[in-house]
């Protein structure tokens, strides 16, 4: 199954990251599983050779540079929408390019993918890039593939890519610090999240003590 393969490879990349292995930050370590999940699927489905895979990465990087220059790509400054959201949008645009779509279709895929993840907060349990980050990479991969399919089918984003990036920046700037990678809000602040932090570190790591 196409989606299950994306799930498998997105998780696998994040497992390597969690075990201190070598990964490529795309655009960050916390979102490093999203692009591999996408690329593994389209490489098989489209029979991409090495050059085509490299073009995929270049296309994704180009869109990522725009986000980095015009907004942000770090969870600490913009929440998870800036990490997995950006990675998903980058992958969607590159998937369209790999499938032979137009530049405009790549832009539409990018806009739809990022729009779908606007507002996603960064709330890592115990401050580690594992829970819920790994599974969010999966969502990023699947979101990218469906956004690419929609763009290739002729669907368009009513809001253009540049404006979606601006909206993401504005949302990120308005997120409270507790929801920007500090591990002090969201899932990290739940009873189970706090218990897991205590289990890992063996002490109260809160800043309020």
From Swiss-Prot:
Keywords per UniProt: 4Fe-4S, Gluconeogenesis, Iron, Iron-sulfur, Lyase, Metal-binding
Catalytic activity annotation: L-serine = pyruvate + NH4(+)
Cofactor binding: number and manner: Binds 1 [4Fe-4S] cluster.
Superkingdom as given in the UniProt entry: Bacteria
Signal peptide boundaries: none
Pathway: Carbohydrate biosynthesis; gluconeogenesis
GO molecular function terms attached to this record: 4 iron, 4 sulfur cluster binding; L-serine ammonia-lyase activity; metal ion binding
Assembly and binders: Heterodimer of an alpha chain and a beta chain.
Protein family membership: Belongs to the iron-sulfur dependent L-serine dehydratase family.
PANTHER family referenced in this protein's UniProt entry, alphabetically: L-SERINE DEHYDRATASE, L-SERINE DEHYDRATASE 1
Name under which the protein is recorded: Probable L-serine dehydratase, alpha chain
Source species of the chain: Latilactobacillus sakei
Gene encoding the protein: sdhA
């Amino acid at each position: 199954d196409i989606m299950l393969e994306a799930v498998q490879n997105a998780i696998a990349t994040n497992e390597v990251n969690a075990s201190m292995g070598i990964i490529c930050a795309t655009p960050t370590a916390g979102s490093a599983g999203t692009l591999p999940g996408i690329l593994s699927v389209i490489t098989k489905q489209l029979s991409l050779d090495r050059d085509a895979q490299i073009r995929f990465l270049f296309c994704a990087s180009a869109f990522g540079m725009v986000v980095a220059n015009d907004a942000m790509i770090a969870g600490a400054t913009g929440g998870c929408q800036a990490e997995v959201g950006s990675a998903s949008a980058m992958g969607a645009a590159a998937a369209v390019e790999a499938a032979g779509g137009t530049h405009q279709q790549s832009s539409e895929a990018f806009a739809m993918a990022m729009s779908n993840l606007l507002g996603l907060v960064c709330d890592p349990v115990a401050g580690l890039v594992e829970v819920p980050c790994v599974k969010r990479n999966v969502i990023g991969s699947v979101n990218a593939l469906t956004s690419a399919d929609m763009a290739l089918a002729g669907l368009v984003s009513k809001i253009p890519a540049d404006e979606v990036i601006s909206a993401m920046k504005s949302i990120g700037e308005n997120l409270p610090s507790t929801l920007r990678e500090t591990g002090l809000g969201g899932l990290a602040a739940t009873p189970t999240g706090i218990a897991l932090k205590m289990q890992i570190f063996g002490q109260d790591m809160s800043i309020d003590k």
